[in-house]
């Protein structure tokens, strides 16, 4: 925090995040095309995704259920009626010339998440379809379009401007990531674009009554880059204002190589997109009975799992919190302790295993460690077959083989 304090001395950052979460449904939001990552370009495209004349979208009920789950997990208001709108703009990877989204009647409003004891409000979360992907680095002399992503269901989670530092923005983003992965509505893989973040950043003097002019940083795809991009943007705006300049309301892009943001375009307003209700989709009513059926189908939330681990496994609050921070780790722990000492397993997961994951910047599923070999390792430490020092070497050997 000391670094941030010196960075913003005399200035108060004001930050809001828009988090785009790709939902894990079998098919796309309005078409029967498969929702799947990593397939050959333009092989998962339906006529509806292309917006050809005569085709009509049909809402994916699974995506609606996942949006409701997020609303319930964040103590939000679930819409009694949701309406889809057309957001009109031209871009090569948007063949219809509009995006189907929710402006006035989103599925979720007025949620809240707690981050380090502070409540950060969620303005709304709405369903919308993703655009295709423009690829600029495959050929030297041309750009190409992959429409596999076109129509993939997104839940866009819009926070209120309650965040006051880059590090707090990262903590909030990690909390959102934790919620969506615990609910199994998304894998949250930022490197694959399953979770992307836009950051709205402005600065003001602590005594000011109104927020400053904001810049939006688009499509940041890692926790580390979110922090770096916001910190750069704060410094940039401070430099402008302290030179008696004016911060422009604009959209900016973060360059991770140069560690800087650069201007993309003047920031648009809602009127620029000519929103109007989508004539192809009727309003969708959501009954209380339907919401309750979704609630009954929800997985255990992080706080609930942490409480259970404290009571069932006699873990202290800190250990349970660290293990339950990641659903993969929490499930891994429960598999390991079926045959291994609970406290020793917790110690090794929190310490050595997490250290390896952080060192190599991967998650548990991407590693070569599984519950069986880790449990056997803990058992050998427990019965003094091997020492702790040897166990560390064995863990490293498992890791690389």
Region roles according to the model:
Residues 2-300, 317, 340-342:
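Basic, nucleic-acid-interacting segments
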Residues 1-2, 349:
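Generic N-terminal leader/presequence segments
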Residues 245-401:
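Long, charged, helix-rich clamp/arm modules that form nucleic acid-engaging surfaces
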């Amino acid at each position: 925090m000391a670094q941030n304090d010196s960075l913003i001395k005399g200035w108060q950052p004001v930050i809001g995040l828009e988090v785009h979460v790709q939902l894990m449904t079998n098919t796309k939001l309005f078409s029967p095309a498969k929702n799947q990552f990593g397939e050959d370009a333009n092989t998962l495209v339906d006529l509806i995704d292309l917006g050809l004349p005569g085709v009509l979208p049909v809402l994916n009920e699974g995506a609606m259920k996942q949006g409701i789950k997020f609303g319930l997990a964040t103590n939000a208001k679930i819409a009694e009626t949701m309406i889809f709108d057309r957001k009109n703009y031209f871009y090569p990877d948007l063949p219809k010339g509009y995006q189907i989204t929710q402006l006035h009647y989103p599925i979720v409003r007025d949620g809240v998440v707690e981050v380090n004891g502070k409540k950060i409000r969620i303005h709304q979360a709405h369903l919308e379809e993703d655009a295709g992907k423009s690829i600029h680095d495959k050929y030297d002399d041309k750009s190409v379009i992959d429409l596999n992503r076109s129509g993939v269901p997104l839940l866009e989670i819009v926070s209120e401007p309650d965040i006051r530092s880059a590090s707090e923005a990262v903590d909030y983003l990690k909390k959102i990531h934790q919620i969506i992965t615990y609910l199994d509505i998304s894998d949250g893989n930022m490197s694959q674009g399953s979770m992307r973040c836009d950051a709205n950043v402005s600065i003001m003097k602590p005594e000011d009554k109104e927020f400053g002019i904001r810049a939006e940083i688009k499509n940041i795809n890692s926790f580390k880059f979110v922090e770096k991009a916001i910190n750069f943007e704060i410094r940039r705006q401070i430099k402008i204002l302290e030179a008696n300049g004016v911060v422009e309301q604009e959209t900016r892009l973060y360059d991770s190589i140069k560690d800087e943001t650069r201007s993309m375009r003047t920031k648009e307003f809602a009127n620029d997109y000519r929103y109007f209700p989508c004539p192809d989709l009727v309003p969708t009513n959501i009954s209380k009975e339907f919401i309750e059926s979704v609630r009954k189908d929800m997985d255990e939330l992080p706080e609930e799992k942490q409480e259970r681990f404290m009571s069932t496994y006699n873990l202290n609050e800190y250990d349970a919190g660290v293990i339950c921070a990641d659903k993969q780790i929490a499930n891994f722990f429960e598999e390991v302790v079926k045959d291994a000492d609970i406290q020793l397993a917790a110690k090794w997961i929190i310490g050595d295993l997490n250290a390896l994951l952080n060192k190599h910047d991967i998650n548990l599923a991407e590693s070569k460690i599984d519950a069986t070999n880790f449990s056997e390792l803990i058992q050998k430490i427990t019965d003094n077959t091997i020492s702790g020092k040897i166990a560390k070497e064995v863990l490293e050997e498992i890791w690389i083989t």
